[in-house]
Design a protein with these regions (language model features):
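Nucleotide-sugar donor phosphate/pyrophosphate-binding loop at the beta->alpha transition
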Residues: 98-100, 107-128, 137-138, 164
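Carbohydrate-associated surface elements
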Residues: 41, 142, 161
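A short, charged, and often flexible helix/loop element on the N-terminal side
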Residues: 40-71, 78, 118
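Acidic anion/phosphate-binding donor-loop and adjacent secondary structure
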Residues: 162-176
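N-terminal subdomain of nucleotide-sugar transferases
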Residues: 1-44, 71
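Short N-terminal targeting/anchoring amphipathic segment
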Residues: 64-85, 95-100
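A short beta-strand/loop micro-motif in the catalytic core of glycosyltransferases
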Residues: 131-140, 156
Length: 184
């Protein structure tokens, strides 16, 4: 299957979104899928106000359309709600191409704390953005419940799992209760 993932979050950022997408692309490729990522590295960008590490693509639609047309994906995943995400959503809607989206961070709460924008306004935008997707993927049951509480009706869990190359639990050892009692 040919899968295209579109994201506004990418290197040089080091965060959970970037790590999740890299891991997802690696695992999908290992399963035999052909995966292409569209990231801000391919576009002219400007720094995000108040968060310059995030680069926002400038007018990405034409180049993104060319990438999508050339790749002809069987599946389109829109990972973020920024300029690239908006352009990918526009493309998919215009062509009646099904797509999925993801909700990675508590963006409305961040915008409210940083700029005083009411939660309801940001969640209204996010319902519009994600509402057209086949599914909006949430990382935890708590986030899924929060989105549903704010009126999202197409939320599914997309848990991250554990990287077994990094995390290897040691064998559990039987506790010697006779000896442990001497420490109490």
């Amino acid at each position: 299957m040919k899968i295209m993932i579109v994201t506004d979050a990418w290197e040089p950022q080091v965060n959970g979104v970037v790590r999740t997408l890299k891991s997802t692309a690696r695992e999908l490729t290992a399963l035999g899928h052909r995966v292409e990522l569209v990231t801000p590295l391919e576009f002219r960008t400007v720094p995000c106000p108040t968060y310059p590490e995030i680069r926002l693509s400038i007018l990405p639609y034409r180049r993104l359309r060319e990438r999508l047309d050339a790749f002809e994906p069987h599946a389109l995943h829109i990972a973020t709600e920024g300029p690239l995400g908006l352009a990918a959503r526009r493309y998919a809607r215009a062509r009646k191409l099904p797509f999925t989206t993801a909700y990675h961070t508590r963006f409305p709460e961040y915008v409210q704390a940083r700029f005083g924008v009411p939660l309801a306004a940001t969640y209204r935008f996010l319902r519009w953005f994600h509402g057209a997707s086949l599914a909006v993927m949430a990382p935890t049951p708590v986030v899924k419940d929060d989105l549903e509480r704010f009126g999202f009706d197409n939320v599914v869990l997309w848990t991250r799992g554990v990287d077994l190359d990094i995390f290897r639990p040691i064998e559990s050892k039987v506790l010697n209760t006779a000896r442990a009692g001497s420490y109490l």
